């Protein structure tokens, strides 16, 4: 690729988006009072990956999420044998579910949002069959009922020949001790990082820009189109085993800056990291981004941060392994001004580089 290319140039510029999100959050806080007659919002979940309210003796959580542009890579490398839309369906569900469960919620119902420019998009039987199968299988993996959805035709908004995929979900937290917020975070907590399965659904616009420059588009497209992990069963297994989860951060947009998502002043010290998969190395080489820019944009091999007391680390890692995932006892919380320090990379992300709340 000629010259350096950044994610903000070809995809999302968070410096212009995040302030508007904060503005909306501020306005939204004025509506919490509308929950009455036995309903009460959990205020500390505003600005988290999922919103929680108390409902009688239980807590409920809700979320809405979108896939982004990963489906455009499936469209680009489609061949006679594969549409790749089973992976696309799976990953859309994964983006929704992995946000929902970060507060301890057990998924209940999930609704689809598939926006198209023209109904012709729906007439591709192979693609639709794969999308529906991937979506269904992912819901089964997450333990969620696919309750329905919306398929709007939006001429003039959606680009012809494409689809905007997203959805919403609701989950239940059966008791207060299973509710996960940042309230329990304390200096000395350990940070467990879970190994990602690759790019997941973030930073795809830059990946697409890289793909366009490569001779072997299919080979790169294949490693981009790996399924994201779904952690719904794992989180419930950890809670069932009475692991004292103090916080969870889903590492998506903003890369490893997301480790400090909690609105608290701690130094997040990361001593060990998983090796980035090949897809990240190709993106870095072709885009010209330096290591700090890559770790500030992508998950770079780790996509979930689970915060637990040191006494629970060994047991938690055993449960993670039994669920088929890999984890690292990666670091710890230290009292101090909010920042993430990646020690082995000599990279520091100051608190101001993640301003979501």
How does the language model describe each region?
Residues 2-11, 124-142, 158-163, 217-223, ...:
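Glycine-/charge-enriched secondary-structure boundary and capping motifs
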Residues 2-34, 40:
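N-terminal amphipathic/basic leader segments beginning at the initiator methionine
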Residues 24, 52, 96-97, 207-210, ...:
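Buried hydrophobic packing segments
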Residues 28-197, 348-351:
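Glycine-rich phosphate/pyrophosphate-binding loop regions near the starts of catalytic domains
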Residues 49, 70, 150-151, 173, ...:
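Gly/Ser/Thr-rich beta-alpha loop segments that engage phosphate groups in nucleotides
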Residues 82-90, 221-230:
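Active-site pocket-shaping loop/turn-to-helix segments
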Residues 90-94, 204, 228-232, 280:
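Short, well-ordered alpha-helical scaffold segments within catalytic/effector domains
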Residues 184-222:
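Acidic, glycine-rich loop-and-beta core segments that form the ion-binding/anion-interacting portion
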